């Protein structure tokens, strides 16, 4: 009889010690926790968390399937994730059996920790990671477009140089034609002089000489117009080349800036993924 009394007193003392300490535990940890102290039949005391309650009260009997009941019945530490559908937020529950000096199970302690903030952090990290990946993909597309545009501009510049070379060839031909025109005009003039000397017999030749001079004059005028057009083409091509060069410089600058942004986005993406993994790990370890 005395042994039974001592055992009951020891059990009461152990449970009472936990009951006295329980209210202080929430202040000792960073997480927001709720604590329940149980004997082998019922809840003795519940210390609610700062931001949530499990809607239990002292005297509530142990429920089959509850983590604390499993811990007490199996004499083992138990951990379980409680989905947010049950209480409106995710929760991790832990339970351990309590023993007397002889190792007999006399009750248990249940601990509930809200994972709401960790879950939010995980969701934000995953969302950030997704946004960063989308942004990085968009930047990659922009970079490809810039590189493609730069290639096209290089092609245009090359074609413009070829046109400029062709215009130069036209100018050279114009010089030659002008020389021929001047020579033809001189020959026409000499022929007209000789026709005049020939008198009546040279009239027919005089008409031909006049036509040669008219043709030479007309050719010279055309050559002058061609020369003006060629110079204008040269001027336009020079302006085009300068514009292309300016565009290429800006494009190179933009490409470099995009590469820098892309590198930065990759770093951010890596950090976001690391943050998501840390948040997920925190959820698993809570």
UniProtKB/Swiss-Prot annotation:
Alphabetically sorted, this entry's keywords are: Transducer
- The record places domain Methyl-accepting transducer at 68-286
Q: Is Zinc among this UniProt entry's keywords?
A: no
InterPro entries annotated for this entry? MCPsignal_dom, Sensor-like_sf
Q: What is this protein called?
A: Putative sensory transducer protein YfmS
User: From which domain of life does this come?
Assistant: Bacteria
Q: Which Pfam families match?
A: MCPsignal
| Gene Ontology BP terms | signal transduction
Among SMART domains, the record links this protein to: MA
What the record says about the induction of its expression is:
Transcriptionally regulated by SigD; part of the yfmT/yfmS operon.
Similarity annotation: Belongs to the methyl-accepting chemotaxis (MCP) protein family.
Function, as annotated, reads: Chemotactic-signal transducers respond to changes in the concentration of attractants and repellents in the environment, transduce a signal from the outside to the inside of the cell, and facilitate sensory adaptation through the variation of the level of methylation. Attractants increase the level of methylation while repellents decrease the level of methylation.
Q: Does the keyword Protease apply?
A: no
Q: Show the GO cellular component annotation of the record.
A: membrane
User: Which Gene3D superfamilies has this protein been placed in?
Assistant: Methyl-accepting chemotaxis protein
